[in-house]
């Protein structure tokens, strides 16, 4: 895992097309902005895990 330190307003690049910017810090919460092409899915981890779990559940087709 790469660990980086960024200040509010600073950005990091992921590849050529994705940027992650620190928008603010309040207590133990960090607000970040992600700028990515439409074809790149961006989800919070808990949402991504839910999507993956739904994909593996059998569907009822009666």
UniProtKB/Swiss-Prot annotation:
It comes from Proteus mirabilis. This is Translational regulator CsrA. The lineage of its organism: Bacteria, Pseudomonadati, Pseudomonadota, Gammaproteobacteria, Enterobacterales. Keywords: Activator, Cytoplasm, Repressor, RNA-binding, Translation regulation. A key translational regulator that binds mRNA to regulate translation initiation and/or mRNA stability. Mediates global changes in gene expression, shifting from rapid growth to stress survival by linking envelope stress, the stringent response and the catabolite repression systems. Usually binds in the 5'-UTR; binding at or near the Shine-Dalgarno sequence prevents ribosome-binding, repressing translation, binding elsewhere in the 5'-UTR can activate translation and/or stabilize the mRNA. Its function is antagonized by small RNA(s). NCBIfam families: csrA (TIGR00202), PRK01712.1 (NF002469). It holds the Pfam family CsrA. GO terms for molecular function: mRNA 5'-UTR binding. It is found in: Cytoplasm. Homodimer; the beta-strands of each monomer intercalate to form a hydrophobic core, while the alpha-helices form wings that extend away from the core. One of its GO terms (biological process) is mRNA catabolic process.
